[in-house]
Amino acid sequence: MRTEYCGQLRLSHVGQQVTLCGWVNRRRDLGSLIFIDMRDREGIVQVFFDPDRADALKLASELRNEFCIQVTGTVRARDEKNINRDMATGEIEVLASSLTIINRADVLPLDSNHVNTEEARLKYRYLDLRRPEMAQRLKTRAKITSLVRRFMDDHGFLDIETPMLTKATPEGARDYLVPSRVHKGKFYALPQSPQLFKQLLMMSGFDRYYQIVKCFRDEDLRADRQPEFTQIDVETSFMTAPQVREVMEALVRHLWLEVKGVDLGDFPVMTFAEAERRYGSDKPDLRNPMELTDVADLLRSVEFAVFAGPANDPKGRVAALRVPGGASLTRKQIDEYGNFVKIYGAKGLAYIKVNERAKGLEGINSPVAKFLNAEIIEAILDRTAAQDGDMIFFGADNKKIVADAMGALRLKVGKDLGLTDESKWAPLWVIDFPMFEDDGEGGLTAMHHPFTSPKDMTAAELKAAPENAVANAYDMVINGYEVGGGSVRIHNGDMQQTVFGILGINEEEQREKFGFLLDALKYGTPPHAGLAFGLDRLTMLLTGTDNIRDVIAFPKTTAAACLMTEAPSFANPAALAELSIQVVKKAENN
């Protein structure tokens, strides 16, 4: 039906007769002439109808936005004065000789000239995806997956599929369950990741595996989360953590070079402890130049409990954040930041406004200055490298609250004051995470997952001091987003059972949930390691949007619903009966 795509026509096509298929993006009726912008997935081209082709001109008068049409005509160069430099096809136009209206369009529920609500865009997603910016994002996504496949194939990785209907295993979120009709009362689980299957593939001898795979997690959603999402899943045997990082870094550098024309360079490597200490986050945005500075040792003897308490507590921390040029902040802005950090558990926000250092105490403005002597203030200013015109904010509490609150404040202030360089790309690796973290109920939970190997510890050493264990794990972070994470896996049955025990999984439960894994570990398991990238998040970064729904063809809302198909929906009672399932309404509290 077509010979060319609208958006691919160039000066090289001048004089050629072409047939185009697509949609009316815009129509301009000048009486004796009608111009339309005709659109397909590759872009837009101007088509015009003149009186010499009366039948085509008459039919063109009926055209409206989003009519699906076919046009045959001749490509010709535009006059110099009519060239549109904002269009890829702006140097040419098509003189139509014939027009076919394939399908008409009703009055549109979306308005291309105004900002539509996200609800409307999701309900009429098939119309939303016609917009050039949305089409371009999905084309970029397709390019990314193609580049990934070629890179992985070139590096000896095998694309192997793993099951979608599997067994529920504890991986940190709730599973989506699928009832079995054949096995009454039993359920499959949709995989949160192919984690155990890819490890089993390593045990099967396939030493380089990858898969671009759907994963499912029934968790509370955020703007950058979806109940179903896509991973670039990777696993290797006989490779160390640095070797895995080297290959995966090369993949991501390849993507940025091919999609953005940007060489990311070598990725710096930072430990979890350093990232938390300097940036208050395990996924620091290095485009922001501000860092947290520890000042607890300077404040242990002050008669100000807000500072002295955490400064003398082994679990406490006092950190300063120097904001270049921050002395210009108004009292209202400072109060807003004070309320902001309370979201993260902080009790307030102390500060020192540095007006003129040379004047000592008279050169600063601070509500806490009366509790600190000149010597301590000078020491704080020296350590933070404060200059005239700067602001210093303080966080004082337990280590987690200080890291969370001051880390979030660092990001917000950096954005508000334009200190974060939005034109840069800042990738890094974060390594050496704690193996376990407090579950809030007196026990421990795996910081990554229970199949991650500890670093340089035997099973006996791990059992004796699990709180000191460092995971042989690594995350890739770009511009403050965790785009991928992985680890060296446990390949020893004794170590795996030790980890299960630390997590409170008794031997009976181990056999019930992971018996197949424990059995497989008995038969010459190779050392193995892997990583998974979030394809949706990578695409989000590479297309310049901050909404993950913009890079998924048919996404769910933050309530995990599809407004277009109205999923989820109630099941047919007969289907439920066949599955031996009865829906019980929850009793309402009076």
Swiss-Prot record:
Catalyzes what? tRNA(Asp) + L-aspartate + ATP = L-aspartyl-tRNA(Asp) + AMP + diphosphate
Cellular location(s):
Cytoplasm
EC top class, in one word? ligase
Query: Does this entry carry the keyword Ligase?
Result: yes
Q: What is its EC number?
A: 6.1.1.12
Q: Which Gene3D superfamilies match?
A: Bira Bifunctional Protein, Domain 2, GAD-like domain, Nucleic acid-binding proteins
Task: Share an example GO biological-process annotation for this protein.
Answer: aspartyl-tRNA aminoacylation
UniProt region (Aspartate), positions on chain: 195-198
GO MF term set: aspartate-tRNA ligase activity; ATP binding; nucleic acid binding
Residues noted as binding L-aspartate in the record, renumbered to the chain: E171, R217, H448, R489
According to its record, what are the GO cellular component terms? cytoplasm
Which residues are noted in the entry as ATP-binding? R217, D218, E219, Q226, E482, G534, L535, D536, R537
Instruction: Please tell me where this protein is predominantly located.
Output: cytoplasm
- Keywords for this protein: Aminoacyl-tRNA synthetase, ATP-binding, Cytoplasm, Ligase, Nucleotide-binding, Protein biosynthesis
User: Highest taxon of the source?
Assistant: Bacteria
Record note on quaternary structure:
Homodimer.
Family listed: Belongs to the class-II aminoacyl-tRNA synthetase family. Type 1 subfamily.
The task this protein performs is described as:
Catalyzes the attachment of L-aspartate to tRNA(Asp) in a two-step reaction: L-aspartate is first activated by ATP to form Asp-AMP and then transferred to the acceptor end of tRNA(Asp).
Q: What is this protein called?
A: Aspartate--tRNA ligase
Gene giving rise to this polypeptide: aspS
